């Protein structure tokens, strides 16, 4: 019998699960709050998709919600107020100067919080790894595809010493 006359399943093809993170899920307190807010928003989207009987959307949203809930459950909150003040660690805001004299500010955060456009980089990024443990005045090499870039650490700040976010 030809497939032309057989009924296709109304159930969408199963989506593969989203892969869990390969590294510990370190987050700032604000990062955990963001994950929880995203989870709550996703639950609302899922309820709306269920109400309109959108099977494909329900499947995708349920998968994403399982992944997000696992990220929340696995979160390891690092309180920046307890970090060492004299060297770069998780939740530090670091002021650096490159070889051309340009000054940039980077904040080291969890994978789910990272947004290079706003100056937040993941703790597992090459930049954060290069800065980890550095002190004011230290020069580090930031490995980049275009070649390593030397950076001088000008300042290190942590949450209790920053202006309000």
In which residue ranges do the predicted regions lie?
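Non-DNA-binding regulatory cores of transcription-related proteins
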Residues: 82-146, 150-151
């Amino acid at each position: 019998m030809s497939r032309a006359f057989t009924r296709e399943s109304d159930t969408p093809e199963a989506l593969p699960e989203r892969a869990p993170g390969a590294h510990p899920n370190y987050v700032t307190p604000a990062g955990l709050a963001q994950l929880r807010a995203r989870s709550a928003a996703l639950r609302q989207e899922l309820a709306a998709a269920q109400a309109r009987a959108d099977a494909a959307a329900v499947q995708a949203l349920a998968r994403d919600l399982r992944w997000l809930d696992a990220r929340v459950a696995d979160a390891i909150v690092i309180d920046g107020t307890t970090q060492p003040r004299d060297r770069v660690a998780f939740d530090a805001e670091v002021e650096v100067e490159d070889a051309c004299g340009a000054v940039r500010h980077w904040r080291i955060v969890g994978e789910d919080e990272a947004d290079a456009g706003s100056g937040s980089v993941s703790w597992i990024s090459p930049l954060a790894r290069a800065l980890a443990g550095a002190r004011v005045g230290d020069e580090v090499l930031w490995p980049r595809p275009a070649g390593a870039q030397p950076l001088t650490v000008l300042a290190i700040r942590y949450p209790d010493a920053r202006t309000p976010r």
